[in-house]
């Protein structure tokens, strides 16, 4: 989506604010013993409270309010009724529909203090997406963003999932352009003022090969290595991108 109307921009901002507030409330109840399914049920309750719809239920028969991925599940995790344990990595990918506008964003936390490798993984994943966000300015291309994400992952000894990509967003969940977490500088789609994109990256302690569970959704690392995912909704601007789902100062330990 390219924003051309002030009304659309206002609705999009409101949607992002509500979406972040719901994710914040989910974050605040993550602890040992809580199940991803309980978190997903709470997400649905909060959507009803705010008068919004869970966006992911609009996608291809998906029946949950969120995607919750734990440890080696990198993305699209089905919320399971399995209690979280100390040291687990949990990613909550979440979005809403508010007055016809969609949101989509994600954060990863460690349940309690992470081990040294997972702390490095968390930092690399967050930096990868933060670095890409800084490149979301007019005149750059999607390959500039992808280059930043993959470079940061590999610099730390990790890889990215290439099967799943960021995307445009607005009046539908997935729009052009695709924003891969890999690429070369100066390649891909040109970024223009007012373009709204989701910049996401799954950084994995693995080869980057994907295994899909029998549930048809949960995407795991092939070797069982852990994974993290971070995602922001961003408006492309001339000098400095605007992060709509501004969770950049959040911590990664709960």
Annotate each predicted stretch with a short phrase.
Residues 1-254:
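Active-site neighborhoods and metal-handling regions in enzymes and metal-associated proteins
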